[in-house]
């Protein structure tokens, strides 16, 4: 059997920055180091950091006063920021800069008392953080996941209306919802460029290009990873068997029965070493050597610098 490796795949610049932030903070700060929420949605990465001494918490209320705390790549609400400030935490913000960009747009809408429509998945930590940027008492922020949700909305002032999106959505679905928004509310304003991040778009584009060459797809990523699930969905919608896995032990021989070409990709929070472990396991369960070929795609050269406070600590070598 042949394996086609999607390109690009795996870690994006935001995830690389978040993981490196945690690892560097472990070097420059005294233990324990607390992280609010999973720093990225990947079980293998989180478990690895736990072994290094990181303490993951759901809320900053669980973090002792004056302790070291890191915000995850998904971002947090203004309320969480205020709670952290009251506890006098040594705070490192690993929020992805592309999520921060969405936050700025929502805060601007709030400052202008504009109603705001956020396209995203209910309960996702990024969505919770973005919704929590809105403070206007005169306007309101609404969460929608589909065009059906849009039809249920009642907007007070269509001429003072803004939209934003979660960064890890399906590109195709989101474009449809945005167009429906513009059709219903011609004066709606939004970001100059879609908020769906470059990495999410590039990984989805890579899968689409590969679909006609494969008859099964394995996506390396965790079940709670939004962007990994969107990759799997692309294959499923095209009628191709697709599986989401973040542990080599979960690879099943039956997935590859009567299959000639297996596509392999990875969500933006899955490390490359895990991709290689999954490939080795596929070869093992198939009881044969597999031919591995890189499928040509977009080259990514995006880099996000570490948080300012962390760069200062690294530069001076001081632990205050």
From Swiss-Prot:
Dimethylallyl diphosphate binds at residues 41, 74, 124, 225-227, 269. Coiled coil: none annotated. Pfam families: LYTB. [4Fe-4S] cluster binds at residues 12, 96, 197. It catalyses: isopentenyl diphosphate + 2 oxidized [2Fe-2S]-[ferredoxin] + H2O = (2E)-4-hydroxy-3-methylbut-2-enyl diphosphate + 2 reduced [2Fe-2S]-[ferredoxin] + 2 H(+); dimethylallyl diphosphate + 2 oxidized [2Fe-2S]-[ferredoxin] + H2O = (2E)-4-hydroxy-3-methylbut-2-enyl diphosphate + 2 reduced [2Fe-2S]-[ferredoxin] + 2 H(+). Its EC number is 1.17.7.4. Keywords: 4Fe-4S, Iron, Iron-sulfur, Isoprene biosynthesis, Metal-binding, Oxidoreductase. It comes from the Bacteria. Transmembrane segments: none annotated. Binds 1 [4Fe-4S] cluster per subunit. This is 4-hydroxy-3-methylbut-2-enyl diphosphate reductase. The gene is ispH.
């Amino acid at each position: 059997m042949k394996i086609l490796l999607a390109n690009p795949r795996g870690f994006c610049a935001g995830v690389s920055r978040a993981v490196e932030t945690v690892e560097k903070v472990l070097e420059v700060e005294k233990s324990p180091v607390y992280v609010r929420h999973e720093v990225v949605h990947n079980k293998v990465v989180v478990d690895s950091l736990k072994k290094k001494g990181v303490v993951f918490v759901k809320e900053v209320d669980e973090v002792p006063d004056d302790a070291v705390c890191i915000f995850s790549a998904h971002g947090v609400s203004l309320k969480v920021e205020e709670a952290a400030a009251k506890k006098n935490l040594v705070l490192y913000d690993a929020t992805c800069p592309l999520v921060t960009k969405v936050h700025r747009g929502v805060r601007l809408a709030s400052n202008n008392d504009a109603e705001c429509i956020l396209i995203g998945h209910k309960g996702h930590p990024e969505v919770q953080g973005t919704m929590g940027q809105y403070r206007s008492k005169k306007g309101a922020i609404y969460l929608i996941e589909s065009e059906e949700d849009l039809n249920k909305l009642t907007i007070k002032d269509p001429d003072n209306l803004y939209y934003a999106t979660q960064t890890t959505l399906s590109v195709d679905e989101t474009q449809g919802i945005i167009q429906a928004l513009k059709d219903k509310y011609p004066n709606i304003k939004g970001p100059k460029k879609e908020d769906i991040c470059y990495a999410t778009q590039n990984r989805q584009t890579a899968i689409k290009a590969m679909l006609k060459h494969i008859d099964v797809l394995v996506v390396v990523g965790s079940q709670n990873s939004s962007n990994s699930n969107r990759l799997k969905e692309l294959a499923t919608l095209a009628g191709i068997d697709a599986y989401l896995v973040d542990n080599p032990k979960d690879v099943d021989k039956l997935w590859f029965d009567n299959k000639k070409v297996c596509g392999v990709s990875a969500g933006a929070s899955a490390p490359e070493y895990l991709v290689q472990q999954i490939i080795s396991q596929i070869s093992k369960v198939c009881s044969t050597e597999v031919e591995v070929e890189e499928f040509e795609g977009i080259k990514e050269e995006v880099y996000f610098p570490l948080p300012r406070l962390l760069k200062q600590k690294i530069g001076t070598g001081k632990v205050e």
